[in-house]
Amino acid sequence: MSTNNSDIRVVVGMSGGVDSSVTAHILKEQGYDVIGIFMKNWDDTDEFGVCTATEDYDDVIRVANQIGIPYYAVNFEKEYWDKVFTYFLDEYKLGRTPNPDVMCNKEIKFKAFLEHAESLGADYVATGHYAQVKKVGDEIELLRGVDNNKDQTYFLNQLSQDQLKKVMFPLGAMEKTEVREIAKKAGLATADKKDSTGICFIGERNFKQFLSEYLPAQPGEMRTLDGEVLGKHDGLMYYTIGQRHGLGIGGDGEPWFVVGKDLKENVLFVEQGFHHETLYSDSLIATDISFTTNAEKPKTIECTAKFRYRQTDTKVTVHLREDGTAEVVFADPVRAITPGQAVVFYDGDVCLGGGTIDTVWKNGQKLDYVG
């Protein structure tokens, strides 16, 4: 990298939150030629006619003016609808539980946004993600963020070398508390703004209500695996494997959990007990396998994996198959593996890549969690 940072243009994806605000502030302090871009991915006027994106953009403007950088808003609603939201709905129609954040990073934040940034002469793009990139030989490795509780490599597992070579993650080596501290010291307008939660395009809204606006709900029976009818479900798309809340089953004994779905019969299967044997599996088949480096991969990889965000790593053996899928075998049984979610591979702190959980297996038999 050039010793004179002012020759290096970095376009920062600014959301109006504290993380991206501090990202822009740090890069500006380091002397880079910084431009702030606000991505409008969703038309999110709420029931009171207030567009939360407008409020967020107002915060971007305040922060950009405070740190002295130019800023723009760019509309990616069409790309988002085509690449992320359509996928999200299609997965729910199949009875699965998708992870739109993974797709959003792959298709929008590090593709559509990256391409737009390059049209502005960007050498790099930067975001407020808690992750790190490190040059090793000719390749860039993706590493976990230092703050274990905030590490976001799980959502970045589909990024390619071409994308990783163009990104900067200034917050990757920091704890969240440090980031807030920097924002306060710099007097940034977003220093005390609370972190956003939930899926980007739903925001704080009720998930069930939101989904019902796009997919017709079909209520049906809630049964045990032995066929006992325990009640009605509101629509299979509202439930995920291992879910406890919202089932409405009373009575004594241990709580009830979702253990499977029958799409043809429109039946939700439930069983009692957090550790019910049906919730455990020993392997999975994953599709959409992608690796963060271009180096030749052995057919069998010993590593660790995460099957959901903020989960402890599990030791696994990954068998890459001729058809581009992978069989992932767990060292110990894992609870509530959910089709549609990401499986992400790690070698220590290095994120190797990942895929989408397609089918779940136990003792050589496919489990009909979704079928």
From Swiss-Prot:
Which Enzyme Commission number(s) are on file for it?
Answer: 2.8.1.13
- UniProt region (Interaction with tRNA), positions on chain: 150-152, 308-309
- Which residue pairs form cystines in this protein? 104-200
What ranges does the record give for the region Interaction with target base in tRNA, renumbered to this chain?
99-101
GO MF terms here are: ATP binding; tRNA binding; tRNA-uridine 2-sulfurtransferase activity
Q: Where in the cell is it found?
A: Cytoplasm
> Catalyzes what?
S-sulfanyl-L-cysteinyl-[protein] + uridine(34) in tRNA + AH2 + ATP = 2-thiouridine(34) in tRNA + L-cysteinyl-[protein] + A + AMP + diphosphate + H(+)
Instruction: Give residues annotated as binding ATP.
Output: 13-20, 39, 128
Q: Does the keyword Transport apply?
A: no
Q: Where is the active site?
A: 104 (nucleophile), 200 (cysteine persulfide intermediate)
Record site: Interaction with tRNA: 129, 341
The source's superkingdom equals Bacteria
Q: Per the record, what is one GO cellular component? A: cytoplasm
Q: What class of enzyme is it?
A: transferase
An individual GO BP term: tRNA wobble position uridine thiolation
Query: Keywords assigned by UniProt?
Result: ATP-binding, Cytoplasm, Disulfide bond, Nucleotide-binding, RNA-binding, Transferase, tRNA processing, tRNA-binding
UniProt xrefs under PANTHER family: MITOCHONDRIAL TRNA-SPECIFIC 2-THIOURIDYLASE 1, TRNA 5-METHYLAMINOMETHYL-2-THIOURIDYLATE -METHYLTRANSFERASE
Family per record: Belongs to the MnmA/TRMU family.
Reported function? Catalyzes the 2-thiolation of uridine at the wobble position (U34) of tRNA, leading to the formation of s(2)U34.
NCBIfam families reported in the protein's UniProt record: PRK00143.1 (NF001138), trmU (TIGR00420)
Name of the protein described by the UniProt record: tRNA-specific 2-thiouridylase MnmA
Give the source lineage, highest ranks first. Answer: Bacteria, Bacillati, Bacillota, Bacilli, Bacillales
